[in-house]
Amino acid sequence: DDPHVSFLGAGYDKVIMLNSFSKTFAMTGWRIGYVLSPHKEAMEQVTKMQYYVTACSNDAMQYAVLEAMEKASSYPDEMRIEFQTRRDLITTRLNQMEGVSCHEPKGAFYVFPKFEIPGLNSEQLAIEMLNEGVLCSPGSAFGASGEGHLRFAYTISAHEIDRGMDRVKTVVDRLRSTNLSH
C-alpha cells in the first residue's frame, strides 16, 4: 500500500539485483527467481555458483512463471485487491475472538496475532492448532518478543481462511475456558 522506493537512485551501474517470484506472484516455496546486472564478470560468477547449487527449476514452475510474466500488467493489482480482502477477513476474524488481538499487517501475507491463554507458550499453542488441523508458526521462532504470538499465512482462499479461523476459535475457546477456570 505504501509508495515504492526505487533502488535506481544509487546508479544502475552499481546494482546487482536478485529477486524471486515468491511474493510478486504468490509462488512461495518454489525457490525460483532471477539475477540482473550490467556486470558481465559478476554474472559469469553468479552463473557458475547457480550451476553447482541448483541444476534447474522444473518445467511446470518455469511455465507458471512465464504465464505470470505475460499477464504481469494486470496481475499485481488484482492480487493486491485479493490479498487485501484476505487480510481484512483474517484480521477481523482474529480480533473477534476473546483473548486475541491482531494488528493489520503492512507488508507480506502473514498476520502475527497475540494470544492471551494463561499457561501456554506459543509453541504449545501452535501444536494445539496443528491438532485441530491449522498450520501456523509459533511466535517464539521469530525471537523472544514473539512469545505469545502465532504467525498465520493468508495465501489460501477466503473460504479456507474462514474454515481455518473457525478451527482457531474452537481451540482458543476450549483453551481459555480450561485454563481460566483453573
Map each language-model feature to its residues.
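PLP-dependent class I/II
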Residues: 1-182
